[in-house]
UniProtKB/Swiss-Prot annotation:
Signal peptide span: none
Protein name (record): Ribosomal RNA small subunit methyltransferase H
The reaction(s) this protein catalyses: cytidine(1402) in 16S rRNA + S-adenosyl-L-methionine = N(4)-methylcytidine(1402) in 16S rRNA + S-adenosyl-L-homocysteine + H(+)
Gene Ontology cellular component terms for the protein in this record: cytoplasm
Function: Specifically methylates the N4 position of cytidine in position 1402 (C1402) of 16S rRNA.
Annotated gene: rsmH
Amino acid sequence: MNGHLPVMLGEVCQLIEPVLGIGDVFIDATLGAGGHSEAILMSSQGALLYGIDRDAYALALARKRLSGFADRCKFVHDTFDKFDKYLSNLHPKVFLFDLGMSSMQIDNPDRGFSYMKSGPLDMRMNESDKITAKEILNGYSETALIRIFRDYGQERYAKRIARQICKARSVSELVTTCQVSQLIRDVCPPHIRKGHPAKRVFQALRIEVNSELLFLRTALEKALDLLQVGGRIVVLSYHSLEDRIVKHLFRSVSVSQLPKGFYINKDPEYKLIGKDLKNPKETEIANNPRASSAHLRAVERVHSHSQAEAQIVEPRA
């Protein structure tokens, strides 16, 4: 029904299916077209899905795709950091975050995500949001643009690109993705980098437009707090900025916190799982090249907060 293939579907199901029972709630916080959730609903009979997406078009596709499970699904049009508003004190057994762009978003030039196809400078996941890439590129100061390109795109030519954008917009407003893509291509030495020179800048703009990294940290912290004992959080990230947030947060909750100068025995509330499932197989990458940058991380809650309370132990003699 659409060209989007769920990334690392087998690995995701391998982590999620064993812990989902009848009546258990799982949150697909980035529902997209519903590919992951469809597989999980098929194999985990009796589990209840809360599917969340800020993209109304994607949500409509998922609703249609999952119509056979309508009695077990609730669909929410919102950003994924707001999932707790809809749970009515429920504690989910599973959270899934697939942070990648869907093919249907990238391949539709009218959405403005692609640097390969001409379209409006939009990049909004939720098309009712106010800020667009056009407003950022034509309205932000040169200093602000440099910060965005460096922080969110890790772009080594951030200063050069921002300067050229400000120069170009002083002549006429930047309107299309191809304008910006060509401007970046003209500024950056082609022999220095692999791939398209606009890739990092477009990533940075998309993150800024949609506040992606801020929402991610907030959502993961809420998920860690609400997750049932025995439940799991599974995250697919696609660039180092996302993965760094996930990695550091998961590591921090899966090790004992030992204050300096105290003898304390405290079992961590979470443990890292799925370390052998981090990256897609070569066969999947061959069939779906967009999966090549995927990175899978997961944690399982092994204790409640009260069970993991610190205990003072005697120092060694």
